[in-house]
């Protein structure tokens, strides 16, 4: 067509004001004046879509008359007015979209639209279009574009269902949801993550996918929103057993893993590195007995018989912390006269393997009942007992004789109470063997009677002390405060093998000995009590070491003595002395800053200090020695 008359819409010799030019632009003038020609042009150049006078709103994507409204804006040579206020971003994008879509007036329609049985009308209603504004055109364009997308989706779905391709997941991007089961075995098409959640659920719809009453098509009228699949028995039957097996696999393995969560031979890897093979076997057997007894006390169902157990725990605890154990200590029938605990000599295990019906009492355990050995053995499960019997049978006579000196002591106590003894030695000290440093007079160990000073401690609550450092051993001893039961395996050392108990530079006494201010004189170290005068300048000495120091966790020691101080004149303290207690406060585990805060908080006057000095004689206040 000829659009030459479009360029004469405005007289270039007549000046029009800016306001009028903005209100009545050439685009709008040409739009209103020549718009009645557009329906005729579209009808004459259409592709057989005439005969729709019902005024159906056109789809602007395939309309042929739309570009003719905006084309003169690009090709006209009229003078343009000054710039006006910028239009919003959405307005410019919408106009640009209209121009891009209208660049080719004779472009072919979409392939999806060409197969529609009833094509949509492309006729423009003349009067309505003339009266419409640009914003109305934009809103109608967005509305028609969205409705056309829905029609396209519906058409694709109908074509795929009619061609027999509905077995594949159709409309994956359309986000179909399942409003309800359409058939007894119908499986809806969902997103991949939703399909994985539906299949392993074991629902009757998934298990009966081969039922002949499956609905193969959704109800009419709801086709775009509901999509179902015909039954495909083979993939479902293949997926469902695999999902079921995967879900049931961990469940079946959990009991065995929980049953073995407390290893029987926990310290076996450590014992294999020992130089003496016989000693290694003794450590292994004692550690097995200790861990097996502690495990049985924590998890009673693993024992052989409920009725033979000496005490029934109410709560289980993890094998590492052992902090939540709660048992009926007063109900134990194995204690004789008191419920503090009992001990078992490992020689009774040997006699039990030989077929004796009654266990033999320990040589130094006259306080224990004759049934204590049988009671402890009854705590072990059949597998643990069988393994112990096999290991005992493999021992030679010399090693079997050493079993007489190994005792398993079970203490019943209150929660949070100490065991009544302290430890000495460690792998990081000269004395490599962990031994009992002291048994407190009124403690549980003293009341039970089996644990003596100088005995080697093999394990506490199933945790082997072989090869551990001194601090680690003290940590294991402190952890034993939490449970209401404690299983300690000790060995009575012969005089030839008794190590030097006080060769360590670290404190071996526990916090329960804080009130003890007596002098403990031994071969190399001396613990004594001194009294110093606290003045405004302090106690007259400086400290070094402490927890978290540059050299690591070290004991608090005296670094140097200040000149002119009372401590220098009296010579009661010397550099290198370790401070154990200060004014009744234990100094173990404190940093140097915390120790100085304690000293600053003391009032002026005499202060009692317990120190440990490496010397043969004590230079402090004399007191009775502790054997």
Curated annotation (Swiss-Prot):
Keywords: Chemotaxis, Cytokine, Cytoplasm, Nucleus, Phosphoprotein, Repeat, Secreted, Transcription, Transcription regulation
InterPro entries attached to this UniProt entry: IL-16 (IPR020450), IL-16-like (IPR055287), PDZ (IPR001478), PDZ_sf (IPR036034)
Pfam families, A to Z: PDZ
Boundaries of every PDZ domain copy: 407-492, 529-614
Residues covered by region (Disordered): 34-136, 162-267, 316-337
Record region (Interaction with PPP1R12A, PPP1R12B and PPP1R12C): 401-497
Compositionally biased tracts (Polar residues): 318-337
GO molecular function, one term: CD4 receptor binding
GO cellular component: cytoplasm; extracellular space; nucleus
Keyword Secreted: yes
Sites bearing Phosphoserine, chain numbering: 217
GO biological process: induction of positive chemotaxis; leukocyte chemotaxis
Assembly information from the UniProt record: Homotetramer. Pro-interleukin-16 interacts (via PDZ 2 domain) with PPP1R12A, PPP1R12B and PPP1R12C. Pro-interleukin-16 interacts with GRIN2A. Pro-interleukin-16 interacts with GABPB1. Pro-interleukin-16 interacts (via PDZ 3 domain) with HDAC3.
Main function: Interleukin-16 stimulates a migratory response in CD4+ lymphocytes, monocytes, and eosinophils. Primes CD4+ T-cells for IL-2 and IL-15 responsiveness. Also induces T-lymphocyte expression of interleukin 2 receptor. Ligand for CD4. Pro-interleukin-16 is involved in cell cycle progression in T-cells. Appears to be involved in transcriptional regulation of SKP2 and is probably part of a transcriptional repression complex on the core promoter of the SKP2 gene. May act as a scaffold for GABPB1 (the DNA-binding subunit the GABP transcription factor complex) and HDAC3 thus maintaining transcriptional repression and blocking cell cycle progression in resting T-cells.
Protein name according to UniProt: Pro-interleukin-16
Organism for this UniProt entry: Saimiri sciureus (Common squirrel monkey)
Gene behind the chain: IL16
């Amino acid at each position: 067509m000829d659009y030459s008359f479009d360029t004469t819409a405005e007289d270039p010799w007549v000046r029009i004001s800016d306001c009028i030019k903005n209100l009545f632009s050439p685009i709008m003038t040409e739009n209103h004046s020549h718009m009645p020609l557009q329906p005729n042009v579209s009808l004459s150049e259409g592709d057989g879509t005439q005969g729709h006078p019902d005024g159906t709103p056109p789809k602007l994507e395939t309309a042929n008359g739309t570009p003719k409204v905006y084309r003169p804006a690009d090709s006209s040579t009229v003078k343009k007015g000054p710039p006006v206020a910028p239009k919003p971003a959405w307005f410019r994008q919408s106009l640009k979209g209209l121009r891009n879509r209208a660049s080719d007036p004779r472009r072919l329609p979409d392939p999806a639209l060409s197969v529609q049985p009833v094509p949509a009308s492309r006729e423009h209603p003349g009067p309505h279009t003339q009266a419409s504004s640009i914003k109305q055109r934009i809103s109608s364009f967005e509305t028609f574009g969205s409705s056309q997308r829905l029609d396209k989706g519906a058409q694709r779905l109908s074509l795929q269902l009619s061609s027999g391709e509905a077995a594949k997941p159709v409309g994956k991007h359309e986000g179909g949801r399942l409003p309800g089961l359409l058939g007894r075995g119908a499986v809806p098409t969902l997103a991949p993550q939703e399909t994985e959640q539906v299949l392993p659920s074991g629902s009757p719809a998934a298990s009966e996918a081969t039922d002949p009453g499956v609905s193969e098509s959704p109800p009419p009228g709801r086709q775009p929103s509901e999509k179902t699949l015909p039954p495909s028995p083979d993939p479902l039957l293949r997926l469902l057993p695999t999902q079921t097996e995967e879900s049931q696999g961990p469940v079946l393995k959990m009991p065995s893993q929980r049953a073995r969560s407390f290893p029987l031979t926990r310290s076996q890897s450590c014992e294999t590195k020992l130089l003496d093979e016989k000693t290694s076997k003794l450590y292994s057997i004692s550690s097995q007995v200790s861990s097996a007894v502690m495990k049985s006390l924590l998890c009673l169902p693993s024992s052989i018989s409920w009725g033979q157990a000496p005490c029934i725990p109410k709560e289980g605890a993890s094998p590492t912390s052992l902090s939540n154990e709660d048992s009926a200590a007063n109900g134990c029938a194995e204690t004789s006269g008191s419920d503090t605990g009992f001990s078992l000599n490992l020689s009774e295990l040997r006699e039990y393997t030989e077929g004796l019906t009654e266990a033999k009492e320990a040589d130094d355990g006259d306080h224990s009942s004759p049934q204590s050995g049988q009671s402890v053995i009854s705590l072990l499960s059949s597998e643990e007992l069988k393994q112990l019997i096999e290991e005992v049978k493999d021992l030679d006579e010399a090693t079997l004789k050493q079993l007489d000196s190994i005792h398993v002591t079970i203490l019943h106590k209150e929660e949070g109470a100490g065991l009544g003894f302290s430890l000495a030695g460690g792998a990081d000290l000269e004395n490599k063997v962990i031994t009992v440093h002291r048994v407190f007079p009124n403690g549980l160990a003293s009341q039970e009677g089996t644990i003596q000073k100088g005995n080697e401690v093999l394990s506490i609550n199933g945790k082997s002390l072989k090869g551990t450092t001194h601090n680690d051993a003290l940590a294991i001893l402190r952890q034993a405060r939490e449970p209401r039961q404690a299983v300690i395996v000790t060995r009575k050392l012969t005089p030839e093998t008794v190590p030097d108990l006080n060769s360590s530079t670290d404190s071996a006494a526990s916090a329960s000995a804080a009130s003890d201010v007596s002098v403990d004189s031994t071969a190399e170290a001396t613990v004594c009590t001194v009294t110093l005068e606290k003045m405004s300048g302090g106690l007259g000495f400086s400290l070094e070491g402490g927890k978290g120091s540059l050299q690591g966790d070290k004991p608090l020691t005296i670094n140097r003595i200040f000149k002119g101080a009372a401590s220098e004149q009296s010579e009661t303290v010397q550099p290198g002395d370790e401070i154990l207690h200060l004014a009744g406060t234990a100094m173990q585990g404190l940093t140097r800053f915390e120790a100085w805060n304690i000293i600053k908080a003391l009032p002026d006057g005499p202060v009692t200090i317990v120190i440990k000095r490496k010397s043969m004689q004590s230079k402090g206040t004399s007191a009775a020695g502790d054997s």
